[in-house]
């Protein structure tokens, strides 16, 4: 390629930047670990790779870009359709993270509103309409602050609703309410068993320390 570029009078590469090297981790299949069949909806290669490592199917959604112009409604529709086949569907949206990297408050607010209206609300309405037991979890995977425009470590809020979940006194989902919750999870890997457990849960706004920054 270098020789072709040079022969055509085009700019040539002068350095090779090797990034993200490492060995393929050996992870236990999600179904073997939890007895649940899962699928992933995402436009981000990292999440596609994680899905493959835990044995989740990857659902491709037309219009999913991994940016703020992603088709939120399409992700919501495809997730609803996938629930007929899978026990658990993970819908990943990169837009708020990208907005924080750009330091763009308006974009971040708009992306969160789109997630709420076009993904969370339709999925919740569908789950309630079925009349079958369900649970719905909303959470970020790590903090990305507008002020720093970069990933960081720290607690992240999550909220759960559905069968066996007793609502607490909070009616808004944000960091302050999560921090005031009586329940925290020092070990992030405890979240999934907590989420899919058949036992009742009496708190819906909790604090979960991030496991890693991506």
Please report, for each region that a protein language model flagged, where it lies by residue.
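Metal-dependent active-site segment of extracytoplasmic phospho-/sulfohydrolases and closely related
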Residues: 111-154
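Conserved small/polar residues in nucleotide/adenosyl-binding loops
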Residues: 1-2, 204-210
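Active-site proximal loops enriched in glycine and acidic residues that flank catalytic Cys/His/Asp
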Residues: 62-63, 92-95, 104, 116, ...
């Amino acid at each position: 390629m270098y020789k072709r570029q040079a022969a055509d009078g085009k700019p040539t590469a002068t350095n090779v930047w090797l990034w993200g090297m490492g060995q393929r981790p050996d992870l236990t299949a999600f179904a073997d670990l939890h007895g649940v069949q899962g699928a992933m909806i995402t436009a981000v290669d990292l999440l596609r790779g994680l899905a493959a490592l835990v044995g989740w199917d990857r659902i491709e959604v037309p219009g999913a870009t991994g940016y703020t112009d992603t088709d939120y409604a399409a992700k919501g529709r495809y997730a609803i359709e996938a629930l007929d086949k899978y026990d658990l569907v993970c819908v990943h949206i990169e837009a708020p993270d990208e907005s924080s990297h750009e330091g763009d408050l308006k974009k971040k607010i708009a992306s969160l509103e789109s997630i709420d209206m076009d993904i969370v609300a339709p999925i919740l309405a569908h789950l309630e309409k079925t009349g079958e037991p369900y649970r719905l979890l909303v959470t970020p995977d790590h903090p990305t602050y507008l002020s720093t425009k970069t990933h960081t470590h720290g607690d992240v809020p999550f909220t759960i609703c559905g069968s066996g979940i007793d609502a607490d006194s909070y009616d808004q989902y944000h960091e302050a309410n999560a921090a005031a919750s009586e329940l925290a999870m020092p070990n992030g890997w405890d979240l999934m068993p907590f989420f899919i457990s058949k036992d009742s849960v009496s708190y819906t706004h909790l604090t979960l320390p991030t496991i890693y920054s991506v």
